Protein backbone atom coordinates (compact mmCIF):
# COMPACT_ATOMS: atom_id res chain seq x y z
CA UNK A 1 0.00 0.00 0.00
CA UNK A 2 1.06 3.57 -0.70
CA UNK A 3 -0.77 6.23 1.26
CA UNK A 4 -3.20 3.56 2.47
CA UNK A 5 -4.15 2.57 -1.10
CA UNK A 6 -3.34 -0.79 -2.71
CA UNK A 7 -0.70 -0.08 -5.38
CA UNK A 8 -2.67 -2.10 -7.94
CA UNK A 9 -5.43 0.51 -7.73
CA UNK A 10 -3.11 3.41 -8.47
CA UNK A 11 -2.75 5.06 -11.83
CA UNK A 12 0.87 4.34 -12.86
CA UNK A 13 1.67 8.04 -13.32
CA UNK A 14 0.23 8.87 -9.89
CA UNK A 15 2.28 6.07 -8.32
CA UNK A 16 5.45 7.40 -9.97
CA UNK A 17 4.75 10.79 -8.39
CA UNK A 18 4.77 9.14 -4.95
CA UNK A 19 8.17 7.44 -5.37
CA UNK A 20 11.70 8.84 -5.45
CA UNK A 21 14.79 6.75 -6.09
CA UNK A 22 18.50 7.41 -5.57
CA UNK A 23 20.90 5.02 -7.23
CA UNK A 24 24.54 4.29 -6.44
CA UNK A 25 25.44 5.52 -9.95
CA UNK A 26 23.50 8.75 -9.95
CA UNK A 27 23.04 11.56 -12.43
CA UNK A 28 23.77 15.24 -12.08
CA UNK A 29 23.16 17.64 -14.93
CA UNK A 30 25.11 20.61 -16.26
CA UNK A 31 23.87 23.58 -14.29
CA UNK A 32 24.00 25.02 -10.80
CA UNK A 33 23.42 23.06 -7.63
CA UNK A 34 20.03 24.83 -7.34
CA UNK A 35 19.07 23.79 -10.88
CA UNK A 36 20.05 20.19 -10.16
CA UNK A 37 18.04 20.14 -6.94
CA UNK A 38 14.97 21.63 -8.63
CA UNK A 39 14.62 18.48 -10.75
CA UNK A 40 13.07 17.11 -7.52
CA UNK A 41 10.65 20.05 -7.23
CA UNK A 42 10.76 22.87 -9.79
CA UNK A 43 9.00 25.20 -7.33
CA UNK A 44 11.27 24.53 -4.34
CA UNK A 45 12.22 27.55 -2.28
CA UNK A 46 15.76 28.29 -1.15
CA UNK A 47 14.73 27.33 2.39
CA UNK A 48 13.38 23.95 1.23
CA UNK A 49 16.58 23.26 -0.69
CA UNK A 50 18.70 24.17 2.32
CA UNK A 51 16.61 21.89 4.57
CA UNK A 52 16.97 18.81 2.34
CA UNK A 53 20.67 19.52 1.87
CA UNK A 54 21.06 19.56 5.66
CA UNK A 55 19.26 16.19 5.86
CA UNK A 56 21.49 14.74 3.13
CA UNK A 57 24.59 16.35 4.69
CA UNK A 58 25.26 18.15 1.42
CA UNK A 59 25.19 21.57 3.10
CA UNK A 60 28.59 20.79 4.64
CA UNK A 61 30.40 20.93 1.30
CA UNK A 62 28.07 23.37 -0.49
CA UNK A 63 29.02 26.00 2.10
CA UNK A 64 32.69 25.58 1.16
CA UNK A 65 32.07 26.50 -2.49
CA UNK A 66 32.56 30.22 -3.25
CA UNK A 67 29.23 30.35 -5.09
CA UNK A 68 27.33 28.08 -2.67
CA UNK A 69 24.09 26.85 -4.21
CA UNK A 70 24.91 28.78 -7.40
CA UNK A 71 28.03 26.65 -7.96
CA UNK A 72 28.08 25.25 -11.49
CA UNK A 73 28.06 21.46 -11.75
CA UNK A 74 29.76 20.00 -14.83
CA UNK A 75 27.97 17.38 -16.94
CA UNK A 76 27.72 14.18 -14.90
CA UNK A 77 29.00 15.99 -11.81
CA UNK A 78 32.63 15.60 -12.87
CA UNK A 79 33.69 18.50 -10.64
CA UNK A 80 32.35 16.98 -7.39
CA UNK A 81 33.28 13.75 -5.60
CA UNK A 82 31.23 10.56 -5.69
CA UNK A 83 30.02 11.12 -2.13
CA UNK A 84 29.05 14.72 -2.92
CA UNK A 85 27.09 13.55 -5.97
CA UNK A 86 25.26 10.97 -3.86
CA UNK A 87 24.34 13.53 -1.21
CA UNK A 88 23.06 16.01 -3.82
CA UNK A 89 20.95 13.25 -5.39
CA UNK A 90 19.52 12.29 -1.98
CA UNK A 91 18.63 15.95 -1.39
CA UNK A 92 17.01 16.17 -4.83
CA UNK A 93 14.90 13.08 -4.08
CA UNK A 94 13.84 14.52 -0.72
CA UNK A 95 12.61 17.71 -2.41
CA UNK A 96 10.04 15.55 -4.18
CA UNK A 97 8.49 14.74 -0.77
CA UNK A 98 7.91 11.11 -1.75
CA UNK A 99 5.76 8.64 0.14
CA UNK A 100 8.32 5.96 -0.80
CA UNK A 101 12.05 6.66 -0.94
CA UNK A 102 14.24 3.98 -2.54
CA UNK A 103 17.93 4.24 -1.71
CA UNK A 104 19.92 1.77 -3.82
CA UNK A 105 23.42 1.73 -2.31
CA UNK A 106 23.11 5.51 -2.43
CA UNK A 107 25.59 6.22 0.37
CA UNK A 108 28.30 3.80 -0.77
CA UNK A 109 30.71 6.66 -1.57
CA UNK A 110 30.40 8.41 1.80
CA UNK A 111 32.22 7.50 5.00
CA UNK A 112 30.41 5.49 7.68
CA UNK A 113 29.96 8.52 9.95
CA UNK A 114 28.23 10.55 7.21
CA UNK A 115 26.14 7.50 6.28
CA UNK A 116 24.99 7.20 9.91
CA UNK A 117 24.19 10.94 10.07
CA UNK A 118 22.11 10.76 6.89
CA UNK A 119 20.21 7.68 8.14
CA UNK A 120 19.51 9.39 11.48
CA UNK A 121 18.28 12.54 9.73
CA UNK A 122 15.96 10.52 7.47
CA UNK A 123 14.62 8.60 10.47
CA UNK A 124 14.01 11.77 12.50
CA UNK A 125 12.83 14.18 9.81
CA UNK A 126 10.72 12.02 7.47
CA UNK A 127 9.38 9.24 9.72
CA UNK A 128 6.20 8.75 7.67
CA UNK A 129 8.08 8.11 4.43
CA UNK A 130 8.58 4.44 3.63
CA UNK A 131 12.27 3.88 2.99
CA UNK A 132 13.51 0.92 0.98
CA UNK A 133 17.27 0.69 1.45
CA UNK A 134 19.43 -1.57 -0.68
CA UNK A 135 22.90 -1.75 0.82
CA UNK A 136 25.95 -3.91 1.27
CA UNK A 137 27.03 -2.10 4.43
CA UNK A 138 25.22 -3.82 7.34
CA UNK A 139 25.42 -0.65 9.45
CA UNK A 140 23.17 1.01 6.85
CA UNK A 141 20.45 -1.56 7.59
CA UNK A 142 20.70 -2.36 11.29
CA UNK A 143 17.84 -0.08 12.37
CA UNK A 144 15.44 -1.21 9.64
CA UNK A 145 12.04 -2.61 10.63
CA UNK A 146 12.64 -5.48 8.24
CA UNK A 147 15.79 -6.67 6.47
CA UNK A 148 15.64 -9.02 3.49
CA UNK A 149 18.80 -11.03 2.81
CA UNK A 150 19.29 -11.90 -0.85
CA UNK A 151 21.61 -14.62 -2.16
CA UNK A 152 22.00 -15.19 -5.89
CA UNK A 153 18.71 -13.43 -6.60
CA UNK A 154 16.70 -15.35 -4.01
CA UNK A 155 15.40 -14.38 -0.61
CA UNK A 156 17.53 -16.17 1.98
CA UNK A 157 16.19 -14.55 5.14
CA UNK A 158 13.83 -11.91 6.51
CA UNK A 159 13.90 -10.29 9.93
CA UNK A 160 15.38 -7.60 12.12
CA UNK A 161 19.12 -7.22 12.61
CA UNK A 162 19.02 -9.22 15.85
CA UNK A 163 16.80 -11.95 14.38
CA UNK A 164 19.05 -12.38 11.35
CA UNK A 165 22.20 -12.52 13.46
CA UNK A 166 20.64 -15.51 15.21
CA UNK A 167 19.00 -17.23 12.25
CA UNK A 168 20.81 -16.39 9.01
CA UNK A 169 24.35 -17.60 8.32
CA UNK A 170 24.89 -15.28 5.33
CA UNK A 171 23.84 -12.16 7.25
CA UNK A 172 25.89 -13.16 10.29
CA UNK A 173 28.97 -13.83 8.13
CA UNK A 174 28.71 -10.47 6.34
CA UNK A 175 28.14 -8.65 9.62
CA UNK A 176 31.09 -10.32 11.33
CA UNK A 177 33.43 -9.71 8.38
CA UNK A 178 32.45 -6.03 8.28
CA UNK A 179 32.92 -5.71 12.04
CA UNK A 180 36.43 -7.19 11.78
CA UNK A 181 37.23 -4.78 8.96
CA UNK A 182 36.20 -1.77 11.05
CA UNK A 183 38.30 -2.55 14.13
CA UNK A 184 41.16 -0.03 14.47
CA UNK A 185 44.62 -1.59 14.16
Specify the residue positions occupied by each region the protein language model found.
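ABC nucleotide-binding domain signature
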Residues: 13, 19-24, 132
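ABC ATPase nucleotide-binding domain helical subdomain, centered on the C-loop/LSGGQ "ABC signature"
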Residues: 1, 9, 16, 34-75, ...
Amino acid sequence: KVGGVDVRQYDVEKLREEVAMVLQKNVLFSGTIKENLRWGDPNATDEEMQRVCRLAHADEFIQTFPDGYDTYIEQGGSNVSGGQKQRLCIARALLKKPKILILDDSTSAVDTHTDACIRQALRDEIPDTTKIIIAQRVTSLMDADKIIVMDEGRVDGVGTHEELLQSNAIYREVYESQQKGSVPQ
